[in-house]
Amino acid sequence: MSTQYSILFKQEHAHEDAIWSVGWGKNSNDGSELVISGSLDDLVKVWKWSDERLEMQWALEGHQLGVVSVDVSPSGNIMASSSLDAHIRLWDLESGKQIRSIDAGPVDAWSVAFSPDSQHLATGSHVGKVNIFGVETGKKEYSLDTRGKFILSIAYSPDGKYLASGAIDGIINIFDIATGKLLHTLEGHAMPIRSLTFSTDSQLLVTASDDGYIKIYDVQHASLAATLSGHGSWVLNVAFSPDDAHFVSSSSDKSVKVWDVSARTCVHTFLDHQDQVWGVKYNRNGSKIVSVGDDQEIHVYDCPI
């Protein structure tokens, strides 16, 4: 039980190249927390968090090119990785074995996200389409067309109603999953949308852009609730805390920032990375944050709860 933000652990030389994506998983055998990292060294690594440190469990081989996105299923036992090799791979977190490989087509699968029911996997594409694959079958089931530019980021709302996509031209689209219809187009940013995240109650959407700003949108009314500045450069990743009180952001300014959602202010800045920070995530109970970056390090931070 911590009363302040602090760095708990640094895993140096975690990969042999930049680490662009990170997630938390769970080992259902012993209940231990896992950290999953995806790197431009073509590897996905699974780390066990125990005794306040990370121990590598597996280095998962299979991708032919850099791994740019990883996501853990809400059920917690399956992990997906997408790579510049245009393949999505599904992995069993219990055994470290590959479940299947999905050919995402002639376009590279940039970001990958599980649906809240763990049944589907969404990935953005070059041609402005979000492709939805069945987790069980590995087959493409349908597409959502933004009729826009290359999609860099995607997110499902936790209630399963919406899917949001962020494009290289700064346009955000929100789809109704049940009907496949495009509900809202948000034009608040002028530069690429690197990341977006829904609040746990699905009411808010937070977006991160190369323009250096973070925006908070009211999902239902598609209205801009706040614009936050503080990072000195591109904002590369955003993620909500499980209780919706905070969200965390990472940037090419080498910092990780924690924001108070209701006060719309930054409450803490971590300056522990030596290079741009590509990935950041809260664990399932909000007690810890993990971050990864170009410095090939994984950092775990303690949060007051």
UniProtKB/Swiss-Prot annotation:
An example Gene Ontology biological process: nuclear-transcribed mRNA catabolic process, 3'-5' exonucleolytic nonsense-mediated decay
Keywords: Cytoplasm, Nucleus, Repeat, WD repeat
Gene Ontology cellular-component terms listed: Cdc73/Paf1 complex; cytoplasm; euchromatin; nucleus; Ski complex
Primary location group: nucleus
InterPro entries assigned to the protein according to its UniProt record, in alphabetical order: Beta-prop_EML-like_2nd, G-protein_beta_WD-40_rep, SKI8, WD40/YVTN_repeat-like_dom_sf, WD40_repeat_CS, WD40_repeat_dom_sf, WD40_rpt
Annotated function: Component of the PAF1 complex (PAF1C) which has multiple functions during transcription by RNA polymerase II and is implicated in regulation of development and maintenance of embryonic stem cell pluripotency. PAF1C associates with RNA polymerase II through interaction with POLR2A CTD non-phosphorylated and 'Ser-2'- and 'Ser-5'-phosphorylated forms and is involved in transcriptional elongation, acting both independently and synergistically with TCEA1 and in cooperation with the DSIF complex and HTATSF1.
Family listed: Belongs to the SKI8 family.
Protein's recorded name: Superkiller complex protein 8
Organismal lineage: Eukaryota, Metazoa, Chordata, Craniata, Vertebrata
